[in-house]
């Protein structure tokens, strides 16, 4: 793992939605803050002499709204459950996978949806994946307390928990906590039970974190003892020597997710350079670079083969003996309902 100070991580978040300077004006990548890692686009730089231009965001729905409102970029990096929104809005076009040699090495499980790949073409190139589970301070939180997701309701941790300001992640938590491990089909009763659980969990929340750097900071400060966290936030804390553990085997389980790149219609830059960029991302050497810099797994099986088991274990990316709710594409109408309900819950309603 790369040693990353919390200060530097927080500085990176200040670049949200701001284009990076001294970069190739012929390719604009709309991406999560922190993904402008040289190891991911090394072959692009070798070919073109400079890195792509970047514009950053911190939330999938925020990014979609910006693109839908007319923001122009060449490629964007949504997580899987957002792809249908971009397709339905007519904002993307298929990739020509004949121009992407490593496409053949992407683990098939990441493409197992007609939303990503159908008779019209390949609409999505999955690239990176991770886990969401319980991060906690083992010096102050007994392991027995985090054996269940109900720790987020415990009066013992009132004002000492944190949840992501991400509708998908909090609903994954709520569904798991109420016995649901597959969110592709959700009944009315399941939705209501999860919403009620979230309202109870909200009472314990000190803050909703916007990005892994923020989550790491509030845990490092001691303000928060238990958080529902992505694995990279845990890696930040580990690298900086703070006491943290990652519980992916709570009785009710944990969640997994993956993200990738879409080819935006009418991009302002070079289509050829968009393919050079995605080919750099998918080359096997990008696997260790991704894990080292950000803590995520790679969808290219050849890339993951270059990552040691020890590094996977440190990153929290090994197999677990517990349920896993995969954040695959779910019903768009239900997702919008969850988003609206989450905003109500955060507001105290």
Can you say where each PLM-predicted feature lies in the sequence?
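Periplasmic-binding protein-like
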Residues: 191-201, 240-265
